[in-house]
């Protein structure tokens, strides 16, 4: 069951909350009429138990049970640290 959970990669845009980070995930979609590729950004709140992620880090997050009103993702790993 654990392998069927959604996994996403994105950039940390906020770490101001305790044990929570905001991760921005960019996806490219094709505009239905103009057929131009358009960048769409979605923000997810993710649980960061040890407060290790910082703004600018590239991270991997995984879907999990509901942790609060807006939070049902958790930090799996930090792929690349910010400079």
Curated annotation (Swiss-Prot):
The reply on keyword rRNA-binding is yes
A molecular function GO annotation: structural constituent of ribosome
Q: A cellular component term (GO) from this record?
A: cytosolic small ribosomal subunit
Tell me which Gene Ontology terms the entry assigns under biological process: translation
Q: Which residues cross the membrane?
A: none
InterPro entries (UniProt xref): NA-bd_OB-fold, Ribosomal_uS17, Ribosomal_uS17_bact/chlr
Gene3D superfamilies (alphabetical): Nucleic acid-binding proteins (2.40.50.140)
Q: Which UniProt keywords apply?
A: Ribonucleoprotein, Ribosomal protein, RNA-binding, rRNA-binding
**Record function comment:** One of the primary rRNA binding proteins, it binds specifically to the 5'-end of 16S ribosomal RNA.
Q: How does it assemble?
A: Part of the 30S ribosomal subunit.
NCBIfam families linked to this entry: PRK05610.1, uS17_bact
HAMAP family listed in its UniProt record = Ribosomal_uS17_B
Protein family (similarity comment): Belongs to the universal ribosomal protein uS17 family.
Protein's recorded name: Small ribosomal subunit protein uS17
């Amino acid at each position: 069951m654990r392998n069927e959970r959604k996994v996403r990669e994105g950039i940390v845009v906020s770490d101001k909350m305790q044990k929570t980070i905001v991760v921005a995930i960019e996806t490219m979609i094709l505009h239905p009429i103009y057929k131009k590729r358009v960048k769409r950004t979605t923000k997810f709140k993710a649980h960061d138990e040890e407060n290790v992620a910082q703004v600018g880090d590239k991270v991997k997050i995984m879907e999990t049970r509901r942790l609060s009103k807006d939070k049902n993702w958790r930090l799996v790993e930090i792929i690349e640290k910010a400079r």
